[in-house]
From Swiss-Prot:
Keywords: Ribonucleoprotein, Ribosomal protein, RNA-binding, rRNA-binding. Part of the 30S ribosomal subunit. Interacts with proteins S7 and S18. Binds to IF-3. The lineage of its organism: Bacteria, Bacillati, Bacillota, Bacilli, Lactobacillales. InterPro entries: Ribosomal_uS11, Ribosomal_uS11_bac-type, Ribosomal_uS11_CS, Ribosomal_uS11_sf. One of its GO terms (molecular function) is structural constituent of ribosome. Transmembrane segments: none annotated. Belongs to the universal ribosomal protein uS11 family. GO terms for biological process: translation. It comes from Enterococcus faecalis (strain ATCC 700802 / V583). It comes from the Bacteria. PROSITE patterns: RIBOSOMAL_S11 (PS00054). This is Small ribosomal subunit protein uS11. Located on the platform of the 30S subunit, it bridges several disparate RNA helices of the 16S rRNA. Forms part of the Shine-Dalgarno cleft in the 70S ribosome. One of its GO terms (cellular component) is ribonucleoprotein complex. The gene is rpsK.
Amino acid sequence: MAAKKVSRKRRVKKNIESGVAHIHSTFNNTIVMITDTHGNALAWSSAGSLGFKGSKKSTPFAAQMAAEAATKVAMEHGLKTVDVTVKGPGSGREAAIRSLQATGLEVTAIRDVTPVPHNGCRPPKRRRV
């Protein structure tokens, strides 16, 4: 019996000049997603998908690597300028923004869209180390 051919979905190259880089930085991981201005995803990466495990995912270096990986894929689509939206309290926020600028994207705006509760859910108890 012949081996089945697995068809891979080929990436269609789009010509998109400007987009939005969404950086979601939690205490445990950093996710970088680059979209066009309408919100359609061009590229994404996270510290966990790059092979960082456990507490290494929450480091600024892991966030930097995630931003570089997403930027490389997005620049293949012709991306040049990007607005940055940052969400979350994690340690990889600034490192990811610096990495976007260092890889050749022009950052036009930085927006913090971290959700702030109007006294909603009770937060988790404080850590005692």
